[in-house]
Amino acid sequence: VLKSIVNYEIMSTKVLILIYSKEIAMIINRNSELEKNMYAKLSQVDELISSNDVYALGLRLNALSSLCKALREDSAVKALTEALDKVIESGIIDSIDKNSLKHFMIGNAFYTASDFTGDDKYKNEAVKLAAGFKNFARNEAGYFKDADDKKCLCKAYSYEPFYMAYETKDGGKEQYNDVIGQYNAMNDELFADTKYSSDTTAKVKVLSVYAASLIDTMEVMDQMIYEIYRKMQDYFKASVKAVLETGRDYDDFDDFDEESELMFAYAVLKGCRMKALHTEKYEGIVLGVCDKVMAGEIFTDDDTDKNVVSKAALVYSETVRNREYQDYGRGKGGALWS
């Protein structure tokens, strides 16, 4: 049981110590130099905008958004708002194919910026973007049809978290049933084929992103609507278990491609913090990935892939936040997570 949290700074290192009743202290080092390097990498959005790399841009903004929520510092908010201002000024939102699901990826970053700054221009951008959900084309199974006509569980990450966030904040929750209905439809149609695919590398990549989509969607929903939350939790746990059933465990993450291991670690850490997974059972599986991110080389190596940088930042944010999850609900009306 968590007894206390001590937060202090020594030289350039911010240290968060959690003390448990069994007198075990877990220390998370937040190195200011590492975070400076991370912001420098993540703020490089100009090339993503000019190349119209919408998926990478959305992933980058998701990473900056996650860091704002985890660190709650002016430097994080500044990095996010500067990136979003470039997005707005570039006009890329208007030039994106509106039939492409990935153009919704940037939506939640606008909401985060609005929450931290109080500036309605970011909220207005989110609402304007969400208007595209109303008449978006659907496939025969009933979920949104992407511009390329390809079906993949991984595509939920492009739009479901933002769809849920919009409905929670500005849509009156009128389409909550559609959000879960789309998850139901794609899960029924695609999950089994993905889980039992002989292409282990491909299915791990898909399932890791799908798990991240589910846990991100759960985070932004009204927690009081338990039936929908529980259904998504079931899908989330099944996805995590399907990845582990490929034979991956503490010693086998070297078999993952780097993006998959990072996304899986992010999903597991977030699932533990939100009590969708049992921390004692699952957290230890991904701590090696956390150590790799905390070492900082990902954020200083000039050859690091742009999406690896973003996903590493997602892991960093949850590594910090996950240490506080057991203190959930205090001062927040009994919320399951914060």
Q: What do these predicted regions represent?
A:
Residues 153-157, 161-265, 277, 281-296:
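Extended ligand-binding clefts on enzyme/binding-domain cores
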